[in-house]
Swiss-Prot record:
It comes from the Eukaryota. InterPro entries: MABP1, WD40/YVTN_repeat-like_dom_sf, WD40_MABP1-WDR62_1st, WD40_MABP1-WDR62_2nd, WD40_repeat_dom_sf, WD40_rpt. PANTHER family: MITOGEN-ACTIVATED PROTEIN KINASE-BINDING PROTEIN 1. This is Mitogen-activated protein kinase-binding protein 1. Residues 749-811, 820-839, 968-1026, 1211-1232, 1369-1397, 1519-1555 are annotated as: Disordered.
Length: 1580
């Protein structure tokens, strides 16, 4: 057999021959060095699977190995032994399809990305033997011919190429184009043809071996379409050719759930319904047809007659607690409402009769199907289904009884909303709270954050087989855990999600201790303080640029919030150095902050900034070395920068990636501090010497960016997690492990000596640091030759003598410069004699290594090489005997324990590095195979065969319109290889025929274009596996490329769905305190839910005192802004407000109201446009943006996404803006230290914006007057008329200042209207009630005895009918029913009755303003978030966009003298126009046929009611002129808005126009009666 070397071609071989020997020698040396680097670390285990369809799973028919892709790696799994082998794709492209050869010796893979290749691998050697690069975008499916001579590959839908490849000759023998999207391919048993299936596509391709062998060039491939008949519009998701007796038949399944059989004439012979919503995959052998369907269902049919045989058991249900599945009964029991993952891929092992299934939650099961009545589970594993964001290694606990997890455990978190606890040595998990489960050998526990089980499914996989992409809205509803951190004592697990919620779980009981909305955006980093610090703090850093410091020892009470950064914070770390506790943080603003902890008061901790460093590149991650002296930071320019923590000076810089492009994403030091691992955006991993910067190892295998990595505590492994949902466990080389363990032993030994000789705690810390530093001989002297940035500024931290900086400079650099170390030459030589030399000296005499190993064993590692006494193999629990049978099919006694036990013989043969002490070939120890069967009971899955009806076609169904000898459009007779038989695709039509099947003409270019357009993403074609970009770099751009921007997927959208004021960050930023260093304990108690989250009891004294000292307006506001997850908060808002209104007993108006910086009157009026009868909110949008708004939005784009700030001033007496614009204390617009430190931002944009906003304030109080008129009451009807005219006058926008009267004693003040700031209210009615304001002192004196009833009446009518009119004019179908209106009126009446205290108007202002505030888009907040969509507040009412340009501004307090006759004329004309429009609309709906649409009746009723309301308002106005001092009582107001006759009788007069109103009502009643009669006649 002529094999082709990996990556070689004729051209490359010719170039090699022509090259000079010296060039070849140099290249050979370089290649050897690179190979050494990649071989230093080997892939030991993969915890993940990336199968996207049935073509991604295959089984070796000889050995039973199951092959599946995991990123850029092919995993070869032996289910019997639970053993993995791996094939790494050297091209770094994602593997999309694979298949075994019939003899099992070779494996063919297809990949995605630019210019993908089809590769053939030797399974035994795991090396590449052949390569074909004839596709452009990606390989959809591959298959070997039964003779292993040919390989067929089909490209992606944009590629549309089918290639038949003689892979041993490296020749493409035949090719053709295919017009449809192809998802599957299958060879016939005799290799004479193969079949492709896809969207409305089943095609038979015929191989003419005689012709292809004679012609050296590629010949056109002959293809003929299957005759689909009625099913031609279906999506065929998978295809399989028959075996033995049914070898002439071909079986397909459709996405709609049909199993179809084609006969040898390509005719659709018969089909059967699978009784499922979706069918994904099919597998055919001699005896059975397996059909993988939705909800974990696998149907089994007889291939001879398509009769139903059985349904296989389902896998685990979604959301199951796998830690409790320790018995077979728990696995095979099913709840009534249980949901299961879909079956997406299957493969069959004919030797063992095992069926392997992959489900779309990334789980793999191997079932024993020897007996369909007794199907057992042989193997199963569960993995993450989405991006894995972070990993944490469970710390080593000295007291094993205190450990919550077994040794060698680690924790991962993912976008699938789960936190998973893994263990690499499952035989050792006894003695902890977690026990062995029967679902996974590696996974111990799944912590599901919420009840949304859909998040557990792979969103990239389109289970329906349709072309619609995954629902991005469903993606955004997921929480997704972004970061995790384990406390040093191993008791608590902290996690932060994408929405900013912080959770803390107790690992012993797995209960949730804390859940608080800490941030406005995703939490990027969590960090517990080290035990050396003497503190138990938790730092939470987020994309909202804030750091919250919580004290874990005090129930996670908030200690401090830091807002120095001006952009996303990517990392935060604690360190204890020189007796000081320090915090270091870095972020996307290119800044590094060093802070020192100080004690404030008795026990509070306060961090103050000591150093601020700015670099020219974004800082993506940071880690502190174990000595706590240096911080290593990974930067966007692919450099690692080392900083001294004490001085803040940069100590060293070196490259952190071998590639020339990309960005460093993560950095991580090992437990000894000798090495540092980095991950780059090119998906590669590298390990460098921490002190010299020399690369010692490289790794690849992930298909997406590596998002996290950690060294294990035993220094044997490096674990990496990635966006491809996989967890890779890498085994480090023996030399690296030995070096790290030797280093740890020396550090511990010197630490013990220092502890014994030290007499003071501070001196202990200093000497321990020096002891760590003194082991510098381990480092290479190459560091002397490298330049060190800012080295001259290095301070003396770590010196054992308190000397000046100049005298100890050399000593502080001892760790970097060996020549200046404190050790003597003799000590250095002794140390060197004990350890192997570092770097580029990997091949050493065996004697040295043996000595090193012995030294290591003598020090601390004897126990790890002790023989393993654990139980070998799977031992069932005591209660399993009656539940399931353990079938041992293994005839080989495994000499090792189960996976990860690493048991070793008693006699250890010390070996050199070249031998296999840490070699990958020493695979996971084999355990006994165990098959778990359900209880012996009647199988419910055995349904009656008659239930699945087999349907067939009449014998002559194709006689009239099909010519079987006609060449197919993809046949060789078609010169351009064009396809024809498939008619253009019709979206959303799956089974209904849309046009006749034509075979008479070739498709025109136009038809091909139409067909191509139909295959776009909007068409029903499954394209989940097609990458968005050639190398799938979209993941990096979304999650790492824009940390300084706010437009990441799931960022602003998720933030907008949260309550604007629910997180700690929001409350912190809304505080108006002038000092940034003010203690923020008050943030814990500003809302009703936060004390419960942070404090153990609601009756905390601080809470009581804080609540009592709060102004009632602030309390009311806090109750208005509650979490959207608690919808009942909004429903209870009225109740809270009434309660607080009962409390007020002070003066008429509080000081808060006197000094309140008001919104413009636009806001006050527009608030009424927002509240509907049932508490819903109708949002209005400003059409024109001011310059300040544009600047504000530009700043939002430069800052982080956050929520809307809408809070009152939390400190009484401090001027602030109600909508948060002028709250200077904490605002995203305020300058931060980072922004001021940059030359490019010499003046903070936040300051400019705040200044402009301040100047733009539309209205300001002088603090002396009465704010009562803001309620909008009408005490005097004469004044009401004037106010109404004034309100109408302000419709005209004037850019100049207008004098406006105030209700204060000064009566007048100046205000500036914003030019072009408009609020259009859609089609107002002629005299719709507007808020009116009093304008003179006389008016105030006249209305002073006014009762609360009169003040509420107009407000009630305003809020109701404004919403109604807006809905009516904008054409909204949602109408407020009279009953709802009445309910709203009742609630407002209750408010009136409650407001019998003198301070009623102050609190009503708060209620009225807070409830109706988010009207102005441009002015609502300084946060980059618009309040257009507040899910959870009002789902029933659609947001109404303004249409009418008539009302461009809301009324202001204009004085009477400012009203001109021209303005009155304009208002009067507008009133007439509005009235005519309303009357015209009324006539149109009443004169039309009422039976045509009942909606017209509703509209007519609404208009009639509105007209009546307008008339009553006019009557009130007339009566008010005659008796201005009259005021209604609360009893009079009851029903006043709805029952005008009561008011008529009450006042004893017949108002003008009642006759016309009654006539109008009578006419409407007659029309309504006619409509009902007509409808009844039609029904009869």
């Amino acid at each position: 057999m002529a094999t082709i070397e990996s990556g070689t071609t004729i051209t490359s071989r010719l170039k090699n021959l022509l090259r000079s020997p010296s060039i070849k020698l140099r290249r050979h040396k370089a290649g050897t060095k690179k190979e050494d680097l990649s071989s230093k670390v080997t892939l030991e285990k993969v915890l993940g699977i990336t199968v996207s369809a049935g073509r991604g799973l295959s089984c070796d028919p000889k050995t039973g190995l199951v092959a599946y892709p995991a990123g850029c790696v092919v995993v070869l799994l032996n289910p019997r032994k639970n053993k993995q082998q791996h094939i790494l794709n050297s091209s770094r492209k994602t593997i999309t399809a694979l298949a075994f050869s019939p003899d099992g010796k070779f494996l063919v893979t297809g990949e995605s990305g630019h210019m993908p290749a089809v590769r053939v691998w030797d399974v035994a050697e795991r090396t590449q033997v052949a390569e074909l690069q004839e596709h452009k975008y990606g390989v959809a499916c591959v298959a070997f011919s039964p003779t292993s001579k040919y390989i067929v590959s089909v490209g992606y839908q944009h590629d549309m190429i089918v290639n038949v490849w003689s892979w041993k000759k490296n020749v493409v023998v035949a090719a053709n184009k295919v017009s449809s999207k192809v998802t599957a391919v299958s060879f016939s048993e005799d290799s004479s043809y193969f079949v492709t299936a896809g969207n409305r596509h089943v095609k038979f391709w015929y191989l003419d071996e005689a012709k292809s062998s004679k012609v050296n060039s590629t010949i056109p491939l002959l293809g003929r379409s299957g005759l689909l008949g009625e099913l031609r519009n279906n999506f065929f998701t998978d295809v399989a050719c028959g075996k033995s007796k049914k070898s002439s038949s071909t079986f397909c399944i459709t996405s709609s759930g049909l199993l179809c059989e084609f006969n040898d004439q390509r005719l659709l012979d018969k089909w059967v319904e699978l009784r499922t919503t979706v069918a994904n995959c099919i597998l055919v052998n001699h005896d059975y047809i397996f059909c993988g369907c939705a909800d974990g269902t696998v149907r089994i049919f007889n291939p001879n007659n398509l009769h139903f045989l059985s349904t296989m058991p389902k896998p685990h249900c979604l959301g199951v607690d796998i830690a409790t599945v320790t018995e077979a009964s728990r696995l095979f029991s099913s709840a009534a409402d249980a949901k299961y993952p879909d079956t997406i891929a299957m493969t069959f092992d004919p030797t063992n009769q095992w069926l392997s299934c992959v489900y779309n939650d990334h789980s793999l099961y191997v079932w024993d199907v020897k007996d369909l009545k007794k199907v057992g589970k042989v193997y199963s594993s569960l993995y993450h289904s989405s991006c894995v964001w972070s990993i944490e290694i469970y710390p080593e606990i000295k007291d094993s009884n205190q450990a919550c997890l077994p040794p060698n455990s680690f924790i991962t978190c993912s976008s699938d909303s789960t936190i998973r606890l893994w263990n690499m040595e499952t035989s050792n998990i006894h003695g902890t709270a977690l026990h062995r489960n029967i679902l996974s050998n590696d996974l111990m526990k799944i912590i599901l954050i919420d009840d949304n089980t859909q998040a557990l499914l792979d969103t990239e996989y389109n289970s329906a087989g349709l072309g619609d992409k995954a629902d991005h809205q469903a993606l955004d509803t997921k929480v997704g855990i972004r970061s995790v951190c384990v406390s040093p004592n191993g008791q608590h697990l902290a996690s932060g999600d994408r929405t900013g919620t912080l959770r803390v779980h107790e690992l012993q009981s797995m209960t949730e201790l804390l859940k608080v909305e800490a941030h406005d955006s995703e939490i990027l980093c969590l960090e517990y303080s080290k035990p050396d610090t003497g503190l138990n703090l938790l730092a939470s850093a987020s994309r909202d640029r804030l750091i919250h410091v919580l004290d874990a020892s005090k129930d996670y009470s908030l200690q401090q919030t830091l807002d120095d950064h001006s952009s996303s914070i990517t990392a935060v770390k604690f360190a204890a150095n020189d007796g000081k506790v320090q915090m270091i943080s870095c972020g996307a603003d290119k800044s590094i902050y060093f802070r020192t902890a100080d004690k404030v008061g008795d026990a509070a901790v306060h961090f103050t900034r000591t150093h601020h460093i700015v670099r020219k590149t974004t800082l993506y991650d940071m880690d502190v070395d174990p000595s706590l002296k240096y911080a290593a930071i990974g930067c966007q320019d692919r450099n690692i920068r080392i900083f001294n923590i004490s001085s803040g000076k940069q100590k060293k810089l070196y490259k952190g990636s071998q590639s020339e492009d990309g960005t460093l994403i993560k950095v991580q030091t090992d437990p000894s501090g000798l090495y540092i691992a980095t991950s780059c955006s090119d998906k590669n991993l590298s390990i460098f010497d921490f002190y010299s910067g020399e690369c010692v190892a490289t790794m690849f295998g992930h298909s997406e960016v590596v998002t996290g990595m950690k060294f294990t505590n035993d220094c044997k492994h490096l674990i990496s997690v990635s966006g491809d949902s996989c967890v890779f466990i890498w085994r480090l080389s023996s030399e690296m492990t030995i070096n790290m363990r030797q280093r740890l032993a020396e550090v511990r030994q010197r630490g013990k000596q220092v502890e014994m000789s030290a007499t003071h705690k501070t001196q202990n810390a200093r000497r321990e640091t020096i002891a760590v530093m003194s082991t510098a001989p381990v480092m290479s002297s190459d560091s002397d030759k490298e330049g060190v940035e800012d080295g001259s500024d290095e301070d003396t931290a770590g010196s054992d003598k308190a000397s000046s900086a100049s005298s100890s400079f050399g000593r502080s650099n001892s760790y970097w410069e060996m020549a200046r170390g404190t050790n003597t030459s003799s000590e250095r030589s002794n140390c060197l004699s004990k350890m192997p030399r570092q770097r580029v000296r990997w091949s050493q005499p065996a004697g040295n290594i043996e000595m090193t190993v012995k030294s290591m064993l003598d020090l601390r590692q004897l126990d790890s090489f002790a023989p393993c006494d654990d139980i070998i193999g799977f031992q069932p629990s005591e209660g399993l005997g009656t539940e399931f049978v353990v079938a041992d099919n293994s005839s080989i006694q495994a000499p090792f324990g189960p996976i990860g036990s690493r048991s070793r013989p008693r006699v250890i043969r010390l070996m050199s590095c070249e031998e296999t002490m840490f070699k990958q070939d020493v695979e996971t120890p084999e355990g006994k195979e165990c098959t778990i069967f359900p209880e012996m009971e009647e199988d419910e899955s055995l349904e009656r065969c008659g239930g699945f009806e087999v349907k067939g076609l009449p014998l002559r169904s194709y006689h009239d319109n099909v010519c079987q000898e006609k060449h197919s459009p993809d046949s060789a007779c078609s010169v351009d290889y064009s396809s024809r038989l498939s008619s253009p695709e019709h979206p959303n039509e799956d089974s209904e025929s849309t046009e006749p099947l034509s075979v008479d003409a070739n498709s025109s270019d136009l038809e091909e274009q139409v067909e191509a357009e139909d295959l776009e993403p909007n068409s029903p074609v499954m394209d989940g596996e097609i990458p968005q970009t050639p190398d799938q770099e979209k993941f990096l751009k979304q999650h790492f490329g824009n940390l300084s921007a706010g437009n990441i997927p799931g960022g602003p959208l998720l933030t907008s769905e949260r309550n604007d004021f629910s997180s700690i960050s929001s409350r912190f930023l809304a505080m108006a305190a002038p000092s940034k260093n003010q203690p923020v304990e008050s943030l814990m108690f500003d809302s009703e839910f936060s004390p419960a989250l942070f404090q153990p009891s609601m009756e905390h004294p601080a809470l009581i005192n804080r609540t009592e000292s709060q102004p009632k307006s602030a309390i009311t506001t806090d109750h208005d802004f509650t979490s959207p997850q608690k919808l009942n908060y909004f429903q209870r808002k009225r109740k809270h407000l009434q309660e607080y209104e009962h409390i007020g007993k002070g003066g008429p108006f509080s000081s808060v109201m006197q000094i309140r910086k008001t919104q413009s009157v636009h806001d006050l009026v527009n608030e009424g446009n927002k509240t509907t009868a049932n508490g819903g909110i109708v949002k209005m949008r400003s059409q024109v943006q001011t310059a300040a708004e544009r600047e504000e939005k530009a700043i939002r784009r430069r800052t982080l996404p956050s929520t809307l700030i809408k809070v009152e001033n939390l400190a009484s007496g401090t001027p602030h803006s109600k909508d948060g614009k002028l709250a200077k204390g904490r605002s995203y617009m305020n300058p931060t230290t980072s922004s001021m430190a940059k030359i490019s931002r010499s003046m903070s944009v936040g300051e400019n914006l705040n200044i402009e906003e301040n100047q733009d304030a539309s209205l300001s109080f002088d603090g002396k007057g009465n704010c009562e008129p803001e309620i909008g009451a009408i005490p005097s009807f004469v004044e009401t008329e004037k106010n109404r005219q004034t309100a109408k006058e302000t419709v005209i926008i004037k850019p100049h200042l207008q004098p406006v009267a105030n209700c204060s004693s000064t009566k007048t003040f100046q205000t500036k209207n914003r030019a072009h700031l408009t609020l259009d209210i859609a089609k107002p009615l002629p005299d719709r009630p507007l808020l009116s304001f009093n304008k003179g002192k006389g008016a105030l004196e006249m209305e002073s005895p006014r009762s609360p009833a009169s003040s509420c009446k107009v407000k009630s009518s305003f809020s109701e009918f404004t919403c109604r009119n807006d809905n009516q004019a904008s054409g909204a179908l949602e109408k407020t029913s009279p009953s709802e209106d009445y309910g709203c009126s009742k609630s407002k009446e209750n408010d009136v009755k409650a407001n019998s205290k003198p301070n009623v108007y102050q609190e009503r202002v708060e209620l009225f303003s807070d409830m109706l505030k988010p009207i102005h888009r441009g002015r609502a907040s300084t946060i980059g978030h618009t309040p257009d969509h507040h899910s959870g507040l009002c789902p029933e009412v659609e947001p109404i966009r303004p249409r009418s340009p008539s009302l461009n501004a809301a009324p202001t307090h204009n004085s009477a003298s400012s009203v001109s006759f021209e303005q009155c004329e304009l208002i009067a004309s507008e009133l007439q126009d509005s009235l005519q429009k309303a009357l015209s609309l009324y006539r149109s709906v009443t004169t039309a046929d009422p039976s045509a649409n009942m909606e017209r009746c509703k509209i007519a009723g609404l208009l009639t009611e509105t007209f009546g309301m307008v008339k009553r308002e006019l009557d009130f106005l007339k009566e008010g002129n005659s008796s201005p001092g009259t005021a209604m009582t609360p009893q009079d107001e009851t029903g006043s808005d709805f029952t005008a006759p009561n008011l008529h009788e009450e006042h004893g007069t017949r108002r003008l126009g009642d006759d016309k109103t009654l006539a109008l009502l009578q006419q409407y009643s007659e029309l309504l009666l006619q409509a009902v009669e007509k409808r009844m006649d039609k029904k009869l």
